């Protein structure tokens, strides 16, 4: 469930020891974080550490950050944890695409979609603009809820099977990574140790790493078999929901390139998710033809293309599409955008673009460059309507109208 939003955006103040600045993604600096909100339950002051985060986003003027609190704490109504991400959304001038993608995930009922809250961020007294406080992708009871895996104990056929958190990551940012036979780069996020997550210290043993590699490779090979063996390797409803959210958003990274997460519980199948990274989705990109609201994207990826060659799988996707349509999820995207924009607009948005005066200026990889915040929001809403209309038309051509539609 999403945390309750106050009527007014909260303010977050981070004061770094000796007024130092965050200059890299490796070095944690000691700091204090304080949150002011009209909701008394959201107010917080706690020691923390802070460093940079992100890949292409780290090279932008408005920097994203990682927080590691001194102790697990609830943040703005979200469950208590130590590890948090602060997303700057610099390339997305609506500041709304990441929130929209995650809202879609929540509406579909995906098992865990990272929760977030907007804040106005101040670092060392400097207003840095509107940020999103996000749950960091990791394992845990209120995150990707899979069993902890001990490298020395969990080695028998049952316990070795979970829990795992994997990422399709062409950057190979983890210690245990491999390429599948179809050249998909798979990395183990958990169990692992990157200095951030005290809950999952150590590395998978060689035996455990071989297990998960064999499991993923077997799942991939099953996609090429004419029977239905592949279903034993994947949570099919989760796969379909993950697919539809990313296809609606035409999410560039989700075409099995990077920021594609899968998790696996003990004795369970691979579950697509959590969702991540929508800032250059929904028409906010100017290369590879992904800016247009027409055409399949995720469907043509290495794994999904094999799934969509199966008529029964296509039928299941259509059935789920119709369910989302009847629930006003696919047809309610414009209202979702309006609600997000209304919450952060006026003062916070105005101050954001005073601090970062680039409205009306191209920023990588913008396709549309609007002169005002309102024009950026209107473009996003128009793009989403065209996208849903196109997808609906394609489904109708193959299957006819949704039942009861």
Indicate where each model-derived feature is located.
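Middle-to-C-terminal accessory/interaction subdomains
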Residues: 10, 20-22, 43-46, 56, ...
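Short strand-turn-strand beta-turns centered on an Asx-Gly dipeptide
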Residues: 36, 124-125
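Residue-level detector of short, conserved catalytic/binding motifs and their immediate flanks
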Residues: 12, 31, 63-65, 84, ...
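A conserved helix-loop-beta module that forms one wall/lid of the active-site cleft
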Residues: 89-124
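Conserved NTP-binding catalytic cores of kinases and kinase-like/nucleotidyltransferase enzymes
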Residues: 1-100
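Short conserved micro-motifs at the rims of enzyme active sites and ligand-binding pockets
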Residues: 24-25, 78, 144-146, 177-179, ...
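Internal "kinase-insert"/substrate-recognition segments embedded within catalytic cores
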Residues: 66-74, 81, 88-89, 109-114, ...
